[in-house]
């Protein structure tokens, strides 16, 4: 059984969950079944991953009367996509995720990004010239609509993803239901010490996405460093007789950060949760933290004039302009 962390709502959130971003249709159902069968009790989803229906098929096979798990045995997160930030769209978007996942409530529902895109059902709405269509809905207004989901029992808790410290404080200044989580990219090359500390000081739990550095990210370029191949990580892993992935996952949970590694390979899914039978020394914890180079892998980029640039940097709510 996995360890849990207690959220500000009192809910218990398992410290290791299965990430489902980039899990292709045809693979994600089996991945979720494999995860549930080897002890995972936390599944991280999002409408934008375009695979919640398959996740729902897996959940239906394992949850309910006469099956191996009850609904309250598992913790399911989903996320509101950028095109659904308008307050009139939030409830419908949540209900669509619930319908696809075949659930009556979510344990946690996050605003996926602080940036609103043009309304509609296209994941990335574009102008005729190919640039992305942004919308001026403010995330504060989106938050007010998110709070109604808690009041209606559609989500037990609500939270944020990819928000910077100023944006978190902005939400806290108006929140009736406080955000309980900020889910952000985090790994030994992007330790996020200041942001993690900021979240904790405001009673938010941090969840790390791409906790292993996302070696299969869509915009990886040849020659970019792969965290799992870092000789220093490999060396530490050997000394514990563990895999590099297990050592990094252990580092996250030992520092108090929830992590959601993605895999569709049953053997690796199982390995990724076998991290509760060893402990990293304080020295190794500090050593891994020292690998930080503030290197962000998960920012959609485009090529302009031969240079790779951040796609959404001109959005007024783009979060990564701030130091943290």
From Swiss-Prot:
Give the superkingdom in one word: Eukaryota
Q: Which reaction does it catalyse?
A: a primary alcohol + NADP(+) = an aldehyde + NADPH + H(+); S-nitroso-CoA + NADPH + H(+) = sulfinamide-CoA + NADP(+); S-nitrosoglutathione + NADPH + H(+) = S-(hydroxysulfenamide)glutathione + NADP(+)
Name the catalytic site residues.
49 (proton donor)
Q: Which Pfam families match?
A: Aldo_ket_red
The EC number(s) attached to this protein equal: 1.1.1.2, 1.6.-.-
Q: Name one GO cellular component term.
A: cytosol
The subcellular localization recorded is: Cytoplasm, Cytosol; Apical cell membrane
Alphabetically sorted, this entry's keywords are: Cell membrane, Cytoplasm, Membrane, NADP, Oxidoreductase
Enumerate the Gene Ontology biological process terms.
aldehyde catabolic process; cellular detoxification of aldehyde; glucose homeostasis; sprouting angiogenesis
Q: Which CDD domains match?
A: AKR_AKR1A1-4
Q: Name one GO molecular function term.
A: aldose reductase (NADPH) activity
Q: Known SUPFAM superfamilies for this protein? A: NAD(P)-linked oxidoreductase
Indicate the annotated site residue(s) for Lowers pKa of active site Tyr.
Answer: 79
Provide the residue positions that the database annotates as binding NADP(+): 10-21, 44, 161-162, 210, 212, 214, 262-265, 268, 271-272
Chain's role = Catalyzes the NADPH-dependent reduction of a wide variety of carbonyl-containing compounds to their corresponding alcohols. Displays enzymatic activity towards endogenous metabolites such as aromatic and aliphatic aldehydes, ketones, monosaccharides and bile acids. Acts as an aldehyde-detoxification enzyme. Also acts as an inhibitor of protein S-nitrosylation by mediating degradation of S-nitroso-coenzyme A (S-nitroso-CoA), a cofactor required to S-nitrosylate proteins. Also acts as a S-nitroso-glutathione reductase by catalyzing the NADPH-dependent reduction of S-nitrosoglutathione.
Tell me its family: Belongs to the aldo/keto reductase family.
Listed name of the protein: Aldo-keto reductase family 1 member A1-A
Please name the gene that encodes this protein.
akr1a1a
